[in-house]
Curated annotation (Swiss-Prot):
Keywords: Methylation, Ribonucleoprotein, Ribosomal protein, RNA-binding, rRNA-binding
A Pfam family per the record: Ribosomal_L11
InterPro entries found in the cross-reference section: Ribosomal_uL11, Ribosomal_uL11_bac-typ, Ribosomal_uL11_C, Ribosomal_uL11_C_sf, Ribosomal_uL11_CS, Ribosomal_uL11_N, Ribosomal_uL11_N_sf
Coiled-coil residue spans: none
CDD domains xrefs: Ribosomal_L11
Name of the protein in question: Large ribosomal subunit protein uL11
GO cellular component: cytosolic large ribosomal subunit
Molecular function in Gene Ontology: large ribosomal subunit rRNA binding; structural constituent of ribosome
Lineage of producing organism: Bacteria, Pseudomonadati, Pseudomonadota, Betaproteobacteria, Burkholderiales
Protein family (similarity comment): Belongs to the universal ribosomal protein uL11 family.
Biological process (GO), any one: translation
Oligomeric form and interacting partners: Part of the ribosomal stalk of the 50S ribosomal subunit. Interacts with L10 and the large rRNA to form the base of the stalk. L10 forms an elongated spine to which L12 dimers bind in a sequential fashion forming a multimeric L10(L12)X complex.
């Protein structure tokens, strides 16, 4: 028989830097889950990734105080900002442009994000990434 699910916890945790401090500790603690066990497992899985890159994670909590977690790909906005070299998006995205993104960079981001996107193919994924970049005030070349 399957375990009874008591809830889901959605967090964004920096790769390789999970520790029991907020927001991880309180979120897992109120469900009675082992915080250090999650931190060690998450840090082990994100060992090969760039340290500090925020990774969305969905933790499934079970009635017997055990858990499983699924890691998603980093948010598109973080990858776009890193590729275009800007610190933050524009306050007026359609009038003030803060950076540029080439088609090659957009394709690279789309390949990374492909598992989490609903796009049918790579070209549709690139257009999705380009739209996100434009809404941040970043000019997209070649799309």
């Amino acid at each position: 028989m399957a375990k009874k699910i008591v809830g889901f916890i959605k967090l964004q945790v920096p790769a390789g830097k999970a520790n029991p401090s907020p927001p991880i500790g309180p979120a897992l603690g109120q469900r009675g889950l082992n915080i250090m066990e999650f931190c060690k497992a998450f840090n082990a899985k994100t060992q090969g990734m760039e340290p500090g890159l925020p990774i969305p994670v969905v933790i499934t909590a079970f009635a017997d105080k055990s858990f499983t977690f699924i890691m998603k790909t980093p948010p598109a906005t973080v990858l776009i900002k890193k590729a275009s070299g800007v610190q933050k998006g524009s306050a007026k995205p359609h009038t003030d442009k803060v950076g540029t993104l080439t088609r090659a960079q957009a394709e690279e981001i789309a390949k990374t994000k492909q598992p989490d996107l609903t796009a049918a193919d790579l070209d549709a994924a690139v257009r999705t990434i380009a739209g996100s970049a434009r809404s941040m005030g970043i000019t997209v070349e070649g799309v």
